Structure formats: C-alpha cells, structure tokens
C-alpha cells in the first residue's frame, strides 16, 4: 500500500527530512531512466522507512533498539532514517559531539543504507545553514511599495498582468500539492469540464515546499494538466500553507514568482498574499498568508502559541483592500477560522478554553464581516459547509481535500466541537458530505473536492454569484475506470443582508469607523482607536423620540463600558482637541445621531452607517492622528461627514483578544524574495 507511506506531519524539520529523502530517491530512480511519479516514489523502501520513522517520531516514540527489531532489514532502514535525521539536526545546531554519537551508531548499520541517508544529512544541513533559519516573505511596507497597488493582480502590471473578466469562472482547490496521480487528474477534470479563467490554490505543497517539490508536485503538474486537456493555460494563484514554509518559504517564493510565465500566462503574483478583482468592480478575492506563523518548529513547543495570525503589515494591507472596495469580498486562507473537528489552539495556549476558533483571524476580519460574502479555507483534508452566519460570518467553507488521500478511518466528520455547527441541507435534512471510494486492497478514502465560482449572469456588479462544489474520486493506488466529477452542492454567495435588527438603547454595541477601526481602550480618560480591541459602548437617550430604539435625529449620550473610567463614562467634546470621558450632563456630552441614508426609513439598525454630531459644537465626531503618538484619538470637526457603523459584538468570548499575539518567546526573521533569486535550489 504505497499511499500508507504518504505520511504528513505538523512538524517543520520532519517534513523537510521527508523532502530531502524523497529528492534523493527521485535522483537515483532518474539515473535508471525511469519516469518518476510521486506514486512510484511512495513504493520505494527508503520512502516507506522514512514514513515510519516520521510517524513514530511525531507521536513522541522515536524509533530505536527498544522499539524496533534491528535484525529485520526493513526496520533497520527505519532506524537509519532516524539516526541520519538526528545527526542532521545536530549539525544545524552546531552540536558536533552529539552528531558524532549518532554517526557512530549509524555506521553499525551503514551497509543497509541503500539510498545514502548520509548524503541526505549533508543536503539537510546545508539548506538550513545556507538560509540560517531566515524565512522568505515579501512585506510591502519593508519593500517601500504602494499599499494601494502592491499585490493587486491587474492587467497593467508593467505589461505582464491579468484582468478577471466580469463573467469569469474561478476554480478553487485546496491542499492540492501532493504530486499524486489523482491530483493531476482532478485538475484536468476542472480544465476540461469548466474552462476556468483562473485557478486559485489554498496552499500546502508536500512535504515541505522545497524548490524541487514546488516543481514536481505543483508547477510541472499544472503544465502537464493543460497539455493533457489540450487547453490554453490560464493564470494560477496560490497562497502558502504551513508545509510551504517548512523549508523556510524559499521554494514557494521561487516557484510563485515564475509560475505563470512558465505555464504560459502573463499574470504575476509578487507576494504570498494577493487581491484579484472582477473588471466591473463588483467582487474581489483576498488571499492571505497564514502559513508564515505556523512554520517554525518552536510553534509546537511555544506555550503561548495559538492561531496562526497574519503579519502586522499584511493586516494593514487587507484593511486597505476592504476599506477601499465597495463590492463584495471572498476571503481565502490556508488555515481555518473555526472547526468542528480539529483543535486550533493548543491545550497550554492562552486560548485553550476556546479550542475551535482562531481568535487572531477573527479579530482581524470581524469589522468587515458585513462586506465578506464567503471565506474559504483548507488545512483540514475534508469538505465541510458550516452553518451560515456562524459567529457573524456569512459563509465559512472548508475545502482542503483536492488531492490529499484522507482515510475514512481518520473520521474527519467527527463533531468534536458541537458549538461549531455544520450547514444542513434544507432539502435532505443532512450535512453535505463527501462520498468514499475503496481501492483494490479494501482501504477506503474520502473523495476529493473543488469549487467553481461563476460570476456570469449578474445584472449589477454586486449581485450574487453561483458557487458549485464537486467531488472527484480518490483512488489510492488503483484508478477507477473513467473517473469523473459529480456535483455535491450549489449555492449563492452574496453580500450579507442589511440587518433588520434595530439598535436598542442601553445595549452593548461597538462603534466601527469608516476606516475599519473600533473605538477601543482609553488612556487617562482619552479613548483611542483600535483594530482589534473594541470596547463596548452604550447609548443613553437625552430626549426619547421613538421609544426604546435609536432613530434618525435622536439626541443621546455615548457611555463607555470601560470600568477604568469609573463614573466619568460619558464621551464628550470639551475645549481640548481630543474627546475624553467625563460626567458632565450637558450638551458637551450630548450627540445627535443621523443615518447616512434614510431611504429605508428613520429607524437605525445594526450595520447602518451613521453620523454623530456634538450638540454643543455642532461638529462631526471622527478620529485624528495626534502628532508624535502611535494611535488615533477622537475629535470633532465641522462638516466632516465622517460616518460610523453600529455593530453588535459577535463573540463575547473573544472580546479583548488582539489580532496578533501580545507576546511570544521567539521572533522570526525574514528577508524579501527578489526576482533574481528565483533559481534557488536545494
């Protein structure tokens, strides 16, 4: 059973060891003139031995004389992989003495080393020493790029661009970079059946995204798929997963820089995050890089680790794209926002009581849920449609199963976190689940899946789009006759509906600025703006005109729930430029609230855009940049026409959590990947 040898673990150095051994075996087989596929590699005894070594080590029981029968040649090979790997780690850490001890033990069995694990040691150590643990990552701000244009895919990129037609079909695949035969067959099916205008991958090229794997398990297979389908190539965009960074990201960046030119398209993706918009400006895809902060071996031992999270400057980049786009957004990530099956936050993390949700991603994008039609992610090797509007997100969809062979025995549909509810098909009353397929050995796998988003047929730019999910046979070692995709489900992605819920007085609410920041904590009674730590406000009527709910033109007070200010909890505009909290019951702490658009009536609902005008100064409330300080405070200004949205706290368990960790015992280093570095090799 060769696919039993396709072991993947959440460990950077073990995954990279698998990559190095796989490359060594491939090189040896190619010397014989054989046509080498990943399926063929998996049948090699050295790959089988390494898989067993990696599996045991990941479980905390590394192979050794106490756990193996070292008179058995196959188990000797498992032990050799272990010894060579440990020696390589010692060399990377400059621990010559321990490396020598592993080498002495290795020599006892070196006559059984049929592929040369010793050379794998050299390759492993040289790669890590070459990059000195420094990751590849292109930070737009560090590069001095323009935030408004960097990473935005368009046809005016120095003559090498791509424009997404308004009637486009976009195919989405996840965790596809296995290099297996059914991965290529699935892509051929997409190209032949749907003729997409572009293809987007949600990350993970196995085992560790080395330059060699990024070619053999990704770009070369994409090129072959277009050749087999006899179709002109279309652009392919990909965001990184954790496996893409297990070799520090240099393989991923070297591939993505040249991917589209090599397959024959004019598109170019300069970073691990991107923005792709329809020509009519109605819809945009935002791809994010969650892999970078789930890539370090220290992650597994970090007691503060939960997440992952985005880099601070990337958060600012996404906010810019959401703040300055009037249409609907589809978010794309490798990692999950939430899960009903997998634990996201470790048992010793700060968020162990919240194991099924990513607190950092939630706080990053919560202010924009009214603009986000859907969020599609991978990482878990399954297809799941979660309940609509769960935790305030219109649609969350898991699509991490486009090539990964998921055994039914792994039970990916087990509901370990019942608070994360799955979507129920109203016609059948059941969850939407993948079918299964057994190979000739009786081993059963869940099928693969992909999505096609169809933008055609819209009258207005922001009209809904049709998304169809398909499943494709997963066949292990034995392909079925004439495999073909079948439809799983079809649904509409649309902008979230305008809230029908009126805003009541004396209820906790958040005030979200037109620039995407909340009114946050206070400093010496002065509230400041925050991306990720909103502080709830309450409205108290000065003159009630329409009962218990806010209405256009009401006069009210804005009260903070921040206990640090005590009884001085009324937001006021006094003689100082900055607004602050006090307890004066006069017009300086009174505000008029006006709806920006009254075409749907005078009642104020959650999500409505409103102005706050101070009753004493007759000036609009807005943030301002206080010179010399790193945060925005509040002030008033005449005729500012600055608007706010009143939002309902969606998840009280996440209040006070920031979009990035407050502290961590280690810091990663990264360098930008430049075009001249594209020919990086292991």
Language model features with spans:
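Active-site glycine-centered loops adjacent to acidic/histidine catalytic or metal-binding residues
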Residues: 175, 203-204, 241-242, 288, ...
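Acidic, histidine-bearing metal-coordination/catalytic regions of metal-dependent phosphoesterases
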Residues: 1-198, 223-238, 444-447, 452-503, ...
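Lectin-like carbohydrate-binding module/patch detector with strong preference for beta-trefoil
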Residues: 500-682
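Extended active-site neighborhood of metal-dependent phosphoesterases/phosphodiesterases
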Residues: 119, 126-159, 212-325, 329, ...
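Short coil/turn segments at secondary-structure boundaries
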Residues: 183-187, 212-214, 250-252, 299, ...
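Short beta-strand micro-motifs enriched in acidic
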Residues: 388, 454-460, 596, 624-626
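Short, Asp-centered acidic motifs that coordinate Mg2+ and/or phosphate
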Residues: 170, 197-198, 328-330, 374
């Amino acid at each position: 059973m060769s696919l039993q040898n396709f072991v993947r673990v959440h460990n950077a150095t073990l995954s990279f060891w698998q990559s190095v051994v796989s490359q060594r075996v491939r090189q040896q087989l190619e010397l014989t003139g054989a046509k080498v596929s990943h399926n063929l590699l998996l049948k090699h005894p050295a790959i089988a031995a390494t898989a067993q070594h990696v599996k045991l080590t990941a479980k905390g029981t590394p192979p050794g004389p106490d756990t193996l029968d070292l008179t058995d040649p196959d188990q000797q090979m498992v032990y050799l992989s272990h010894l060579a790997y440990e020696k390589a780690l010692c060399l990377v850490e400059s621990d010559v003495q321990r490396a020598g001890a592993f080498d002495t033990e290795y020599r006892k069995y070196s006559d059984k080393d049929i592929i040369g694990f010793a050379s794998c040691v050299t390759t492993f150590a040289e790669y890590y020493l070459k990059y000195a643990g420094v990751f590849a990552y292109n930070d737009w701000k560090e590069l001095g790029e323009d935030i408004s244009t960097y990473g935005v895919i368009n046809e005016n990129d120095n003559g090498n661009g791509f424009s997404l037609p308004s009637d486009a079909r976009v195919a989405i695949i996840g965790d596809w970079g296995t290099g297996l035969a059914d991965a290529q067959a699935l892509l051929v099916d997409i190209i032949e059946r749907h003729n997409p205008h572009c293809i987007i991958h949600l990350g993970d090229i196995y085992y560790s995204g080395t330059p060699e794997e990024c070619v053999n398990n990704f770009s070369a297979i994409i090129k072959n798929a277009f050749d087999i389908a006899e179709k002109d190539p279309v652009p392919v965009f990909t965001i990184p997963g954790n496996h893409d960074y297990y070799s520090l990201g240099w393989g991923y960046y070297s591939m993505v820089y040249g991917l589209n030119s090599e397959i024959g398209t004019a598109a170019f993706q300069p970073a691990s995050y991107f923005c792709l918009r329809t020509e009519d400006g109605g819809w945009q895809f935002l791809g994010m890089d969650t892999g970078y902060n789930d890539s370090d071996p220290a992650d597994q031992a970090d007691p503060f680790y939960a997440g992952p999270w985005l880099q601070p400057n990337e958060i600012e980049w996404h906010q810019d794209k959401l703040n300055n786009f009037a249409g609907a957004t589809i978010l794309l990530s490798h990692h999950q926002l939430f899960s009903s099956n997998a634990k996201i936050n470790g048992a010793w993390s700060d968020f162990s009581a919240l194991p099924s949700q990513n607190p950092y991603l939630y706080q990053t994008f919560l202010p924009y849920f009214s603009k986000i039609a859907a969020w599609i992610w991978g990482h878990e090797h399954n297809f799941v449609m979660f309940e609509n509007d769960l935790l305030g997100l219109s649609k969350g969809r898991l699509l991490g199963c486009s090539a990964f062979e998921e055994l039914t025995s792994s039970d990916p549909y087990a509901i370990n976190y019942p608070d994360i509810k799955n979507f129920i098909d109203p016609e059948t009353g059941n969850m939407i689940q993948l079918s299964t397929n057994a190979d000739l050995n009786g081993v059963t796998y869940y099928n693969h899946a992909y999505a096609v988003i169809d933008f055609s047929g819209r009258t207005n730019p922001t009209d809904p789009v049709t998304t169809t999910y398909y499943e494709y046979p997963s066949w292990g070692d034995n392909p079925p006759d004439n495999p073909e995709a079948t439809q799983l489900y079809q649904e509409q992605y649309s902008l979230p509906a305008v809230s029908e819920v009126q805003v009541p007085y004396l209820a906790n609410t958040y005030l979200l600025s037109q620039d995407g920041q909340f009114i946050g904590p206070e400093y010496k009674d002065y509230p400041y703006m925050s991306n990720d730590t909103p502080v709830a406000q309450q409205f108290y009527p000065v003159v009630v005109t329409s009962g218990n709910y806010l209405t256009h033109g009401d006069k009210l007070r804005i009260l903070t729930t921040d206990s640090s200010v005590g009884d001085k909890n009324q937001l006021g505009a006094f003689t100082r430029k900055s607004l602050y909290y006090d307890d004066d019951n006069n017009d300086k702490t009174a505000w008029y609230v006006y709806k920006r658009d009254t075409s749907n009536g005078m009642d104020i609902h959650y999500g409505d855009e409103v102005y706050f005008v101070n009753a004493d100064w007759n000036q609009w409330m807005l943030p301002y940049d206080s010179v010399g300080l790193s945060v925005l405070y509040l002030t008033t200004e005449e005729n500012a026409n600055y608007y706010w949205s009143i939002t309902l706290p969606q998840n009280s368990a996440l209040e006070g959590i920031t979009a990035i960790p407050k502290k961590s015992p280690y810091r990663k280093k990264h360098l930008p990947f430049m075009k001249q570095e594209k020919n990086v090799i292991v």
